[in-house]
Amino acid sequence: MRFKLLLWIFIMACSLTFGLAKASARTNSVEFPAGLPWLNVTEPLTMQQLKGKVVLLDFWTYGCVNCIHVIPDLHKLEQKYGNQLAVISVHSPKFDNEKQLSTLTSIVRRYGMQHAVVNDVDFQLWRAYAVRAWPTFVLIGPDGKYVGQTSGEGRYDVLDRAIEQLLAEFKGEPNLKPLPIRLLDPLNTVLAAPGSLAVDERYIAISDTLHNQIVLLDHQGKLVKRLGSGIAELKDGHSDSSAFSSPQGLVLTENALYVADTGNHAIRRIDLTSFLVTTIAGNGELAQGRLVPGSTPTEASLRSPWDLALDKTTLYIAMAGSHQIWTLDLQSSQLKAFAGTGQEALLDGKRLDAAFNQPSGLALRADKLWVADAEASAIRQIDLSSGKVETLVGQGLFEFGLKDGGFKRALLQHNKDVVVLDKHTLAVADTYNHKIRLLDLDERQVMTLSIGTELNEPGGLAVFNGELYIADTNNNRIVRWHLKDQKLTEVQVPATAKLESAP
């Protein structure tokens, strides 16, 4: 009776995607297919060796912001249940680039995943468990039987209750043997997965994302300042007494540097005279459900702000986790939704009726705001005068590739940033194609820029003084392309920029 009650709670609370069999008729779990690549373990796992533990399978794809949002919940469950629970992230990749073990390895390291990861490249496990969405959680009981599944964020409480109940109901011998976990070695580089940058006549500002810090250089390559302790937390203060968490987009002004502090779900301001870091929006908590502004910006819960653009006193925010663009008025401190309903879709029209797909990059010029709409592999344009949203390049969530040509035919793959090169041209960080693409706004054509080097998931762009700066994220470096001379150089970041004990 208690087990039937458990199943009822699990079904009702989670809105399970498929009905569950009665306890007496539950089916066996599916064995992990031989030959799949594994990370964070010394050997492939089997369902047989996991018997006696509750097994939680987390089906995800690494470019999905919703999948990133649930990683802290997985960590909490691991910490609470220890060896009674086996958490396994089953990576079922959406994009072609995500199938590569090398890029998956970079992501597992970037997000500090502490449990086993298996790369389900051909969707064998996905199909076996009839999964339909990312993220989806599948529970296997200690008896090795399938219990149920649920999809989406905010499932910690119901998973916690179900795991606790499954352990209580199990009459067999518990399996407390530790799994053969061996975590990836940390990066030993000056920069670690730099995600974004901003450049003006004084500074080259870099989001040293995996080191949870901001690096300020001058144009001679001298370190001006490191900001952030390296510990992933939300903490205001001066220089290294402050703290960030996976910072991304940056905007430089005469007096300040604004930071999209993605992992903290916050917007930060760095005073460029005192180097005091303050939080100007976000309370450090991930908003669950629909985003609401809050009585003040710092009381609001945000969802993975990824990039910023500034127009006088209006700060535009690419709110990747809510599939929207928000604005923060720096004078009135008013925070509000600017474009997008919050639905994940490729819908044009009036800005508040339109829909976006994990917007990750912004570029602003005069009355136009361009959006790198990553999950739709699209570039969107918002006319700030008329309020109209238009898709320039991109055909939908599952249409992607590497194709030049007219806007209607061209294809991108999970592009994460966009900048204005001149009044006729946009440059796009075509992240999963490892390319820089150029969009001719007059001829409505897309071409690939040949820069003579192998990029690896470039995540951020900046333009200054005839040079295109590129955050070459998975190569842990910054490079610049001289637009006139067609030459590439690497920005030499001094060793003093490296954290003494990077986390």
For each feature predicted by the language model, list its residue ranges.
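Short active-site neighborhood of thiol/selenol oxidoreductases, capturing the structured segment around
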Residues: T46-V65, I88
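Gly/Pro-rich loop segments of beta-rich domains
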Residues: L176-G195, G221-S246, L276-S304, Q334-Q358, ...
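N-terminal "domain-start" segment that seeds a small globular fold
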Residues: K22-M47
